């Protein structure tokens, strides 16, 4: 098993990327790590070269670069070289903490879409604070600002596969993010998508879900268009972090009694903080392309990088991409019928 690593992508690259890879190497001795990066920056950081190979590159795609132009012009960048290694079969998966748009472009245009998937989407696992399971799949997080009803329908299929193969959730409960629970809510795209998903035999669709219910455990897969999904994700993350901050401030301002109570509650707050910590969860996955492609937060540190390697390992071992490819090929008539509903 080989993972191609964009060693130069991210706010703390290459130092935290290399540290994370070395942690992962010690955890997962069956993985070979291909580090793509600037030799003079990466080489001094590697303490032990076992199961690690450096492939020197001369360019870096910066966070502010225009994604498609950067992918096309910076052909010797760490990200593009890593993507091409996956395309050529020299690696099984691609990891980056760099420019999200450029990674999406590299995944779609270099590694390529699975035949039959119209729009690959960005998915992540978010915590559930109630219900049967600890996590749920949320997608699209912004790969596609606009979506057709058939795209949302396909996301239900992709998300269900990720839930079963990676999160271990069989017969995942799928819901559509909308501005109300009733069937007739939303714009025309969401109304059509609701009907397509309701009539589908490909997954277990339970109807709409509102953004306020995202963390309540009522779904194992929540499907959204990229604009709404990205906005809901950032609002949820921001609200959760602000609430924890406000609770901490309130405890510190209530005198000795409040501080004593806060000490008693500290383990509970740590558990909540851990569930909300992206360093624990791994990265966001580009579903619908021909290999696992995973993006961690730009500010991710070594532990987040290492945890993401475990996530990628599971995707490969569970045959996530081959199983999606087979299912899409076997159900092409059903997918075409969904497009014809537009």
Curated annotation (Swiss-Prot):
It comes from Leuconostoc mesenteroides subsp. mesenteroides (strain ATCC 8293 / DSM 20343 / BCRC 11652 / CCM 1803 / JCM 6124 / NCDO 523 / NBRC 100496 / NCIMB 8023 / NCTC 12954 / NRRL B-1118 / 37Y). This is Phosphate acyltransferase. Signal peptide: none annotated. One of its GO terms (molecular function) is phosphate:acyl-[acyl carrier protein] acyltransferase activity. GO terms for biological process: fatty acid biosynthetic process; phospholipid biosynthetic process. Catalyzes the reversible formation of acyl-phosphate (acyl-PO(4)) from acyl-[acyl-carrier-protein] (acyl-ACP). This enzyme utilizes acyl-ACP as fatty acyl donor, but not acyl-CoA. It comes from the Bacteria. The gene is plsX. Belongs to the PlsX family. Pathway: Lipid metabolism; phospholipid metabolism. The keyword Isomerase does not apply. The keyword Cytoplasm applies.
């Amino acid at each position: 098993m080989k993972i191609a690593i964009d060693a130069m992508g991210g706010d703390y690259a290459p130092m935290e990327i290399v540290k994370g890879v070395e942690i992962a190497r010690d955890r997962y001795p069956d993985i070979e790590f291909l580090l793509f990066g600037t030799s003079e920056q990466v080489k001094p950081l590697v303490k032990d070269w076992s199961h690690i190979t450096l492939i020197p590159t001369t360019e870096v795609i910066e966070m502010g670069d225009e994604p498609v132009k950067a992918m096309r012009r910076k052909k010797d960048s760490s990200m593009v070289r890593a993507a091409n290694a996956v395309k050529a079969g020299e690696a099984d998966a691609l990891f980056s903490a760099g420019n999200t748009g450029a990674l999406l472009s590299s995944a779609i245009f270099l590694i390529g879409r699975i035949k039959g998937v119209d729009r690959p989407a960005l998915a992540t696992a978010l915590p559930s604070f109630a219900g049967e399971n600890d996590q749920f799949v949320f997608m699209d997080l912004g790969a596609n600002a606009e979506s057709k009803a058939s795209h949302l329908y396909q996301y239900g299929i992709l998300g269900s596969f990720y839930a079963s193969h990676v999160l271990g959730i069989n017969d995942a409960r799928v819901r559509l993010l909308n501005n109300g629970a009733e069937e007739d809510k939303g714009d025309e795209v969401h109304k059509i998508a609701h009907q397509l998903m309701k009539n589908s035999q490909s997954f277990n669709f339970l109807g709409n879900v509102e953004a306020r219910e995202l963390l309540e455990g009522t779904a194992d897969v929540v499907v959204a268009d990229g604009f709404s999904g990205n906005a809901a994700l950032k609002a949820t993350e921001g609200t959760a972090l602000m609430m924890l901050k406000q609770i901490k401030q309130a405890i510190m301002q209530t005198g000795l009694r409040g501080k004593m109570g806060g000490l008693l509650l500290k383990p509970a707050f740590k558990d909540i903080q851990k569930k909300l910590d992206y360093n624990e969860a791994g990265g966001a996955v580009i579903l619908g392309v021909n290999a696992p492609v995973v993006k961690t937060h730009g500010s991710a540190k070594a532990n987040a990088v290492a945890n993401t390697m475990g996530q990628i390992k599971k995707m490969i071992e569970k045959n996530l991409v081959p199983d999606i490819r087979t299912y899409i090929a076997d159900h092409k008539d059903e997918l075409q019928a969904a497009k014809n509903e537009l």
